């Protein structure tokens, strides 16, 4: 994994716009229903770049829909009031917030850069920010996560009134720090019975 101290946002924006221009004609005549900025942490891109691409999308795919849905995935660590407002201003209508867990211990095991309190506060800010919809991501099957840990996450997130939850079972990716920690016994994944109970608790 290559880590840069600064995200090359301008170069990436130019590349996305160039590819959009090159491919748009292949979809001419189709009605655009939604656009999704996902696949990692697009909130690191910045509202200016996202806004330029949204403008490009509207230019390439003119839509008569007033309710065109444009979703952005965001890490709670980036979800300040100013950042949320900036994305709303450039046309993002729906926010998907990657909470993953509200347990500090679980978040540390996942190498996340926010705490449970940070995540909950970010969700509450997002719900106040004026998006047409907000979604939160949660993971179960986490290392050393009990059924009680999982139901606590579900209960606390549901209590915010968030209209949509995306729930996933953890996938341990190859050649990651998490895989190494599981392989050498430093972390233990829940048994199949515990994971099944977590699924049933949903």
Model-derived features: positions:
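C-terminal scaffold of the Radical SAM
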Residues: 2-26, 30-202
